[in-house]
From Swiss-Prot:
InterPro entries: Cyt_P450, Cyt_P450_CS, Cyt_P450_E_grp-I, Cyt_P450_sf, Cytochrome_P450_fam2. It comes from Homo sapiens. The lineage of its organism: Eukaryota, Metazoa, Chordata, Craniata, Vertebrata. The keyword Ligase does not apply. This is Cytochrome P450 2C18. It holds the Pfam family p450. The gene is CYP2C18.
Amino acid sequence: MDPAVALVLCLSCLFLLSLWRQSSGRGRLPSGPTPLPIIGNILQLDVKDMSKSLTNFSKVYGPVFTVYFGLKPIVVLHGYEAVKEALIDHGEEFSGRGSFPVAEKVNKGLGILFSNGKRWKEIRRFCLMTLRNFGMGKRSIEDRVQEEARCLVEELRKTNASPCDPTFILGCAPCNVICSVIFHDRFDYKDQRFLNLMEKFNENLRILSSPWIQVCNNFPALIDYLPGSHNKIAENFAYIKSYVLERIKEHQESLDMNSARDFIDCFLIKMEQEKHNQQSEFTVESLIATVTDMFGAGTETTSTTLRYGLLLLLKYPEVTAKVQEEIECVVGRNRSPCMQDRSHMPYTDAVVHEIQRYIDLLPTNLPHAVTCDVKFKNYLIPKGTTIITSLTSVLHNDKEFPNPEMFDPGHFLDKSGNFKKSDYFMPFSAGKRMCMGEGLARMELFLFLTTILQNFNLKSQVDPKDIDITPIANAFGRVPPLYQLCFIPV
């Protein structure tokens, strides 16, 4: 057969398959924008700002609608009511991890972020129990965060009030906290291997948040054949996993079955206990993936929030001054801030919450999937369907947060100036797939920011009104622009 004829036949079959799949699924799925054969709704989506496109679609199709990434239908939940009903009220049914082809290529379904079913439940249960045993949610982990905050201050003093890019310094602090749990040690802030690891995580977040990755996720069959930045993600993860494997081997050589030093030891002991179970989820490959997930999630999200937070404090010096006034009044200069202080610092607490609400770090969340056929708001969503939950639609809800596009700590204060909780505050997602380290992340944000502002004034290189706070990436995660500032000792 002539190659040209064969190509035309293949494309025709693909075209007809696309039409059949899209039409056969529409009867059960929510309505949405009409997809084109093969490419779906890609031309109607702004891959530079997916969340904005979904908001526009919701104005036409309501809080539950379907879009197509290539041939694949994706159900989108928009607004607090729909997101809450799915992730909390129907938490078990919506607890699957949805399709994220670029990550799946690297992760192979292992670890905790992108695993599913029995594997995910067993690994998550083990992680939660082990993290609690190593102080998560207890005073002991707070002591570690406070100690790391003091190390961070000493490192910032070494800048001698000169302009500096805070990216890696702010990344080192939360990374060292999670390293103390995983590896039972911490890095020096100038350790080159440490800085290389930080750069790999940082670069991966930037790439994952790029428009190109959204294109790759739309057409996963082409990932292995296309050049582009998605290949750099695989290279970076290979570097990180190589380092993690080195540390695992070190632990294996000195393992004491009766005295676990850290998370890796606990996992290795569990592996030994289940060595005769051929169905065990506790393998070296699983340990590498789990540690890599914890390493990345425990570092990059908190460091990016800190970096964006300082940029906002530079932009709004009047907010910074109020926080420093409250720190001076409640904490003073002779001791470090602690979590007990938070209840006496409503304005500072409001600022920390508003930073997270405003930056909207993961606009469309990590994808979910339904674990069975689900009846949801008069629709039948088939088992395995990928679900996108718009966190932007919750964190930037204009009824709960008037003028949501404005940075305003008043969103979390009542008329008397007391801190005001909000059910709409879900930067860490919600339900069964909620971030395991939420409590630690909140602690780190509060203690790192207050300790920095207790010891330094922040000085911008430009007039505050000229500071650009527009993210340089808006897709998977919102990444702040690069900037420099001076840490002036008080």
